[in-house]
């Protein structure tokens, strides 16, 4: 018994930061959770989950979502020929959450209130037990106050508690199951981000700082409440980044086959993305051999490097099974069902087709289908790229404003390189190259639809298909910004200012939105004002920061303005996520769903809006 307790204690000490990161991410995601549907595409996933749960077939919509009360299919499913031709990945992994909802019934929210309270208490206990130096502010022990507050909040939640129905007309248990699954994935994603940065920067305060920025400089928290697969894709992509970094910076060669297994698994969720990730990972393998030849000599050690891409087949097994269930062919993806009636494809592929080996006809048809999805207009290509990156024509949030550290890199690096000659270690250069290759894989995977992405009102509220790119771009920014002494030497004060900004600006912005936000007549135009305001604010702060930083380093002016602007810059994406969460909950969930799970949050929302 003593040996067991000693082992547990060693594990807790070794992974104390990982545990704290998981608890914090889990707690924050539950706090802002409001399971809903934002886009009609989500009808497919929730129908798949419903029919899986009931033990029914999952190819055709049986009418729970996306149908009118008289049993008539909506225009969306008429266009889709009533097929549920999305991968079954997210519905399958959401089944355990659905079974948990079955156990609790209408009082699943009661379970969530208890879980939320225990998470808060667990956070305090971890801080007290493993990080006592951070448990006090001056002479005041804030963790004691938080314990008292957790019981006050628990009693308040019980007072305001009301059940959420999971049976009957206005019930959406599938929404809750998928949202809960997304929250778990989000929490594990946060732990993987910490491990990536710990491997790059070692055990340092900069790792914690970088983890916070990687999670907040994205849209991942926002998407946890909805039934799209963006959190799942981000989770898998983050795992690929983790294994790639571990391969580069440790001596364990088996991380490389793991990268390709995860890429095969990514194909189950997003085959079009996995294809390009695989291609750029092959370039990554070649690059690894060139820069680390000594690691792979004699040639017997290089065998794993050469054969690693073949491990993709192992990860792709669920993808192939999914294809067979829908199309009767291991190599033909389910979404082909939506194309089989088009003149461009004919009747080459159909769900009644028996299993066939890969042939030139099959590959040719798939290539034809892929080419038919390309939506690039050469005359507007550059303006479309500019729009997607900074100011989409649709009014959605561009990619760059949500990754301010990456923009700092482009503003600061040239000046710093000229005047101070920034040096990168061999390990940092490897990481930068890996992040560049993985970023390119995401961008090129979806550049085929750049015109539609820039203009489509359905690509909202951010460039959601490009959301995996947030992580590698922020890591690039962290590596570069880590070379600035003014940032590295003032992490504590910067973090204090970031948290202070969140505490002050988020409530003020929510109140301002409730009073002055120009709510449009159409939901599709809902996001433009907030996105424009946040984007413009980030760009202005970015320019001012660059000026102040140059003044400090070149002309020896005070560093305080630069640090304050940097803190505001880092805080802005998370403010956008929270504001967008409340905005969508107030106005943009007409397709169905629940309000905030936590009763205190629900009352706060009602008080503001």
Residue ranges and their predicted role:
Residues 188-196, 233-250, 258-263, 279, ...:
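Specific aromatic-rich, kink-prone transmembrane helix
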């Amino acid at each position: 018994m003593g040996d067991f307790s000693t082992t547990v204690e060693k594990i807790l000490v070794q992974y104390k930061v990982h545990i704290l990161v998981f608890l914090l991410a889990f707690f924050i995601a539950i706090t802002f959770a409001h399971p809903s549907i934002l886009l009609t595409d989500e009808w497919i996933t929730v129908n798949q989950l419903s029919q899986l749960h009931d033990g029914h077939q999952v190819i055709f919509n049986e009418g729970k979502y996306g149908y009118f009360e008289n049993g008539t299919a909506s225009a969306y499913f008429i266009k889709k020929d009533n097929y549920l031709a999305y991968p079954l990945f997210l519905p399958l992994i959401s089944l355990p959450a659905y079974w948990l909802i079955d156990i609790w019934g209408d009082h699943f929210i009661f379970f969530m209130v208890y879980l939320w309270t225990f998470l808060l208490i667990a956070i305090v206990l971890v801080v007290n037990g493993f990080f006592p130096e951070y448990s006090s502010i001056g002479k005041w022990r804030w963790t004691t106050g938080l314990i008292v507050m957790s019981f006050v909040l628990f009693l308040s939640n019980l007072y305001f508690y009301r059940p959420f129905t999971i049976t009957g007309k206005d019930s959406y248990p599938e929404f809750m199951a998928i949202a809960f699954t997304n929250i778990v994935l989000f929490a594990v994603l946060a732990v993987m981000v910490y491990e990536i940065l710990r491997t790059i920067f070692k055990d340092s305060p900069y790792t914690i700082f970088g983890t916070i920025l990687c999670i907040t400089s994205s849209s991942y928290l926002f998407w946890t409440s909805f039934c799209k697969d963006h959190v799942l894709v981000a989770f898998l992509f983050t795992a690929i980044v983790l294994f790639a970094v571990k391969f580069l910076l440790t001596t364990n060669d088996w991380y490389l086959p793991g990268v390709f297994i995860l890429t095969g698994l990514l194909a189950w969720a997003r085959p079009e993305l996995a294809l390009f990730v695989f291609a750029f990972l092959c370039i990554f393998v070649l690059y690894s051999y060139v820069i680390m030849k000594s690691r792979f000599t004699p040639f017997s050690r290089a065998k794993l490097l050469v054969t690693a891409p073949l491990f993709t087949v192992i990860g792709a097994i669920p993808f192939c099974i999914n294809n067979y269930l829908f199309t009767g062919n291991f190599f033909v993806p389910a979404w082909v069902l939506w194309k089989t009636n088009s003149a461009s494809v004919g009747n080459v592929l159909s769900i009644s087709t028996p299993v066939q080996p890969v042939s030139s006809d099959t590959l040719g048809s798939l290539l034809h289908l892929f080419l038919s999805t390309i939506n690039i207009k050469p005359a507007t290509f550059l303006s479309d790229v500019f729009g997607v990156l900074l100011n989409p024509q649709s009014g959605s949030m561009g990619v760059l404003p949500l990754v301010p550290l990456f923009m700092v890199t482009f503003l600061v690096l040239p000046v710093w390189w000229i005047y101070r000659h920034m040096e990168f270690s061999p390990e940092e250069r490897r990481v930068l190259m890996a992040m560049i290759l993985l970023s390119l894989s995401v961008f090129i995977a979806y550049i085929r639809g750049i015109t539609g992405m820039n203009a489509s009102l359905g690509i909202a509220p951010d460039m959601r298909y490009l959301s995996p790119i947030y992580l590698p771009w922020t890591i690039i920014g962290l590596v570069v910004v880590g070379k600035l002494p003014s940032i590295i030497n003032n992490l504590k004060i910067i973090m204090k200012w970031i948290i202070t900004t969140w505490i002050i600006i988020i409530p003020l912005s929510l109140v301002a939105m409730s009073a002055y936000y120009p709510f449009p007549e159409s939901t599709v135009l809902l996001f433009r004002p907030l996105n424009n305001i946040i984007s413009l604010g980030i760009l202005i702060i970015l320019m001012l920061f660059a000026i102040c930083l140059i003044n400090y380093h070149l002309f020896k002016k005070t560093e305080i303005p630069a640090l304050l602007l940097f803190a505001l810059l880092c805080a802005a994406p998370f403010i956008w996520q929270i504001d967008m969460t409340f905005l969508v909950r107030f106005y943009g969930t007409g397709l169905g769903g629940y309000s905030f799970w936590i009763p205190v949050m629900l009352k706060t929302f009602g008080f503001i809006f």
